[in-house]
């Protein structure tokens, strides 16, 4: 990774992106591809890219496509299964696949560095959960996004799909699973490196590490003035556009911007931990990502899953995440992060959320103090043969869920949200899941609402479409469009059904 060593005072840029994770990396790549003359600066507090929320051990990183995540298909109060979110996430992830295919076909990134195909499985036990999974399968498999989904309640069939979840399990247990072979494991940290390595070849792109945003404010000239600390020196920078993609810390920076749109937001930090296994005799037996159902009362990000992961060329098994609570907004943040985010404008909504979600807070604290054996016992619900000696505990990344002011007080939201200034000169990304997997769709939306997109919008839209789908695919409204895209992506990325 290359970047200049000296950040000069009063440098002017067309766009400054705060944070060198997957979001900023994706946005910077989109800008350089369709607006190559735009002068971009990316600043990162740490000494390398993708080290916080994007880090391989810090995020779910499963290549979310809503294939197996049961929390994306909730049952409403009338007992009806809601699949709209799953369809949206799947289509968004296909956009990510399309971009990677386009870039790879042109030799701009190397998919072998970050992408592997691996089946995605949903696994449940008990009559009620099996009924839910069968209902989910029937509803989803009608759509082309999930037409390849398989369902089985056969113990032996499930054993052939994922032997570790059946070893030491009673063959008479009531079990069921769905499988989609076209799942992925994505190392978003490695992908971010690929993006930044490629765009750094553009003379209009600068990337600075060990550079921290201190403050930002709007000037009389309709520009943003940023104060940053770079290698121990305080430097002022000017730009027409700012993107805040600093993970959990984004809420603090958004508040410093003082845009009116920021006043309704607060943050609720949630930490996480993984059980990790490197034992080759186990990692070689599990080639799938298996998602279960969350415990009643647990937050959506705590849906248990047993994942095959490839990180820096090595195969791991990860189980979790186990939730926890800390006042930090970043893994390498400050314990004062939460307190510094409390303002007059969000105090009432944050207190209201705290009162309404007392059970959740108690759950997070109880999870924080679980013993190793207790966590392994939890793992045994999915992998009955698990032994404590084969697993060790590691901290996962930090998440800051959105607290949003409402007419009734405050609402705690699990998801992502884009905040834009009225004039399009500043954008910020708040929240967490599904996050990285839908980065391409999210950043396209950010770009379209930014002041950078004020030129010939028709021409820019055309460039974006060509970037994702190649010029030979003309009609996005065609009924066979998704089928055409998936076939093209499979061919380029190397998935063979």
Curated annotation (Swiss-Prot):
InterPro entries named among the record's database cross-references: FAD/NAD-bd_sf (IPR036188), MQO (IPR006231)
Alphabetical list of SUPFAM superfamilies matching this protein:
FAD/NAD(P)-binding domain (SSF51905)
Keywords linked to the UniProt accession: FAD, Flavoprotein, Oxidoreductase, Tricarboxylic acid cycle
Which top-level group of life is the source organism from?
Bacteria
- What's the cofactor? FAD
Name the reaction it catalyses: (S)-malate + a quinone = a quinol + oxaloacetate
Which GO MF terms does the UniProt record name? 2-hydroxyglutarate dehydrogenase activity; L-malate dehydrogenase (quinone) activity
What pathway does this protein act in? Carbohydrate metabolism; tricarboxylic acid cycle; oxaloacetate from (S)-malate (quinone route): step 1/1
Write down the HAMAP family for this protein, in alphabetical order.
Answer: MQO
In Swiss-Prot or TrEMBL terms, this protein is called Probable malate:quinone oxidoreductase
Lineage of origin: Bacteria, Bacillati, Cyanobacteriota, Cyanophyceae, Synechococcales
